[in-house]
């Protein structure tokens, strides 16, 4: 195992020094996980899209001088439903139109972090 996505401690990846290897923590968020948002908090599909955009706006501004990670935890069986998907699509289209944004995966964040910082 090279990395985990269990800690909500930071918007940056960070390294754990372990006896066998350097384990990377790739950021994770509970706030932008659609299952708790819809089922526990009861937000609407539109509100979830707005939450993504609002979080992005803050992190994009903060990231102007120091890059940030913004994980969005999704499950296709849930947010992939047509009544929910249109607002997710709206949020991704909003994010994608900004400069210096990398839409990526945890694997790629791990690879990038190891190349740059270890």
Label each region the model flagged.
Residues 1-66:
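Active-site-adjacent pocket scaffolds in enzyme catalytic domains
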């Amino acid at each position: 195992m090279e990395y985990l996505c269990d800690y909500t401690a930071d918007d940056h990846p960070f390294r754990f020094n372990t006896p066998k290897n350097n384990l990377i923590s790739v950021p994770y968020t509970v706030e932008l996980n659609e299952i708790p948002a819809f089922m526990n908090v009861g937000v609407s599909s539109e509100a979830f899209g707005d939450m993504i955009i609002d979080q992005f706006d803050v992190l994009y501004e903060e990231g102007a001088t120091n890059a940030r990670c913004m994980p969005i935890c999704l499950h296709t069986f849930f947010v992939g439903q047509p009544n929910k998907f249109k607002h997710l699509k709206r949020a991704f289209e909003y994010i994608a139109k900004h400069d210096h944004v990398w839409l990526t995966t945890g694997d790629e964040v791990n690879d990038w972090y190891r190349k740059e910082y270890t």
